[in-house]
């Protein structure tokens, strides 16, 4: 059986080397997030200030995988 993961939304606060980011979740927790392979292959740029969806393991709640970058409300598309 596959491990259940929690999915949270958060804000990128800091960019770290090797595709790692510091993410402040909506519940005010600060965790370390890394970019998932799909986002890396699609060349999606993630910058500080972006809102993201992050998948967190139940066993280690200090690290998570960034699985989606949410669209910003003030973009001029």
UniProtKB/Swiss-Prot annotation:
GO cellular component: chloroplast; cytosol
Stretches assigned to the S1-like domain: 1-71
PROSITE patterns documented for this protein: S1_IF1_TYPE
UniProtKB keywords: Chloroplast, Initiation factor, Plastid, Protein biosynthesis, RNA-binding, rRNA-binding
Recorded GO MF terms: ribosome binding; rRNA binding; translation initiation factor activity
Pfam family, one: eIF-1a
Domain of life of the organism encoding this protein: Eukaryota
Keyword DNA-binding carried by entry: no
Listed SUPFAM superfamilies: Nucleic acid-binding proteins
Subcellular location: Plastid, Chloroplast
Record has Chloroplast as a keyword: yes
HAMAP family: IF_1
Function: One of the essential components for the initiation of protein synthesis. Stabilizes the binding of IF-2 and IF-3 on the 30S subunit to which N-formylmethionyl-tRNA(fMet) subsequently binds. Helps modulate mRNA selection, yielding the 30S pre-initiation complex (PIC). Upon addition of the 50S ribosomal subunit IF-1, IF-2 and IF-3 are released leaving the mature 70S translation initiation complex.
Oligomer and partners: Component of the 30S ribosomal translation pre-initiation complex which assembles on the 30S ribosome in the order IF-2 and IF-3, IF-1 and N-formylmethionyl-tRNA(fMet); mRNA recruitment can occur at any time during PIC assembly.
Protein family (similarity comment): Belongs to the IF-1 family.
Protein name, entry field: Translation initiation factor IF-1, chloroplastic
Encoding gene, per UniProt annotation: infA
């Amino acid at each position: 059986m596959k491990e259940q993961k929690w999915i949270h939304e958060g804000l990128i606060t800091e960019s770290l080397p090797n595709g790692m980011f510091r993410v402040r979740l909506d519940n005010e927790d600060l965790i370390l997030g890394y970019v998932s392979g799909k986002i890396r292959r699609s060349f999606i740029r993630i910058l500080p200030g972006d809102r993201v969806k992050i998948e967190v393991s139940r066993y280690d709640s200090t690290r998570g995988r960034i699985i989606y970058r949410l669209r910003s409300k003030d973009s001029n598309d």
